Amino acid sequence: MGSPAHRPALLLLLPPLLLLLLLRVPPSRSFPGSGDSPLEDDEVGYSHPRYKDTPWCSPIKVKYGDVYCRAPQGGYYKTALGTRCDIRCQKGYELHGSSLLICQSNKRWSDKVICKQKRCPTLAMPANGGFKCVDGAYFNSRCEYYCSPGYTLKGERTVTCMDNKAWSGRPASCVDMEPPRIKCPSVKERIAEPNKLTVRVSWETPEGRDTADGILTDVILKGLPPGSNFPEGDHKIQYTVYDRAENKGTCKFRVKVRVKRCGKLNAPENGYMKCSSDGDNYGATCEFSCIGGYELQGSPARVCQSNLAWSGTEPTCAAMNVNVGVRTAAALLDQFYEKRRLLIVSTPTARNLLYRLQLGMLQQAQCGLDLRHITVVELVGVFPTLIGRIGAKIMPPALALQLRLLLRIPLYSFSMVLVDKHGMDKERYVSLVMPVALFNLIDTFPLRKEEMVLQAEMSQTCNT
């Protein structure tokens, strides 16, 4: 600043306010670089050649910030007493301290400032997942969410810490959207055993598996359970399982049951057919019989075989041919054994009133007689003029006499004897009997009850 001799002249050139301040400063503290700096470790001070000897506040430099100063003297006096500096931080940084600094008379700035990197709130860790960040929670850091196996990310996969100290997008979550897995067995095919229409089929109950938390509901079955007897046909079996998020997993398979069949048989004309099981399945047996007055020719029973063919020959019902030329009454009766019931009407003369009335009533009830397999045998007269008649066939007198003697039928009075299909004497009558009373008695016979069932199935009835 020149020699001491010229200092008074120079002081006269300074502004009055600055001159006053200079006069108040002790000369011993006025030395180059004596100004105190409020800078922190990340702040840098500097000096300019033109005012390095000015003993005022140190120059300001804020890391990650910009400084705008206005000195009262203008020009290069930006650290002189009274200088005001505005501090602004760069994007992504925030100011810690006052945004306005003033150079004070103690050669110190009015505050200490620093620009620190902005920081967003710590992200919440999503359940069943997590996230990875490039630079923690600081400004411009990118964080990417991820989920554990079995879970799907819902929301923004990537978020960024913004200048407003908030994360971009909405926080993500991990939800269980993957259905549980369940595997069913393969198709079950079975063939029914002989004389059966169902098959017992078993399998292991499938277990579900969840890729998320492994917690599942009970397995729900739709269809018959394992170990059941399955009828013929295709059967759909379905298993369903849910996880805790109500995702549903299903699997299906079929149980196929086949029944070997030979094809349906038909009852012979004027006959009956009774079959076991379903009538035409492997192992089923069909039995045949004929209505009254007809004899069965062919196989009385046929079985459906494993080669799907029926055993035996086709049965037919032929009109019964009674042989009246046999020598004994026993041989005559044997022809009716298990085939026909006999109602033997005996009279000493054809003019007998009871005989004529009874014969008239029986003729009117012919349908009931046929329905109950009853053959009427007439014994008319007394030996040697005795006549035996079965329908249109006439038996010899000697055979007719044997029949009377075998069954102990009175020779000189009207009487009737009812013989069942096993040759047993079931009832005797010495007077007229109404056909309905006769039929009611026969309908109580055990064998007759079986016949009634078959006739009902064949819709065989008498309308009169």
Curated annotation (Swiss-Prot):
SUPFAM superfamilies the record matches: Complement control module/SCR domain
Gene: SRPX
Tissues showing expression: Detected in fibroblasts (at protein level). Retina and heart; less in placenta, pancreas, lung, liver, skeletal muscle, kidney and brain.
GO CC field: autophagosome; cell surface; collagen-containing extracellular matrix; endoplasmic reticulum; membrane
Stated name of the protein: Sushi repeat-containing protein SRPX
Domain Sushi, first and last residues per copy: 57-117, 118-176, 260-319
Residues making up the signal peptide according to the UniProt record: 1-30
Cysteine disulfide links: C57-C85, C69-C103, C89-C115, C120-C161, C147-C174, C262-C304, C290-C317
Gene3D superfamilies tied to this protein: Complement Module, domain 1 (2.10.70.10)
Gene Ontology biological process terms, A to Z: autophagy; cell adhesion; negative regulation of cell proliferation involved in contact inhibition; phagolysosome assembly; positive regulation of extrinsic apoptotic signaling pathway in absence of ligand; response to endoplasmic reticulum stress
Record localization: Cell surface
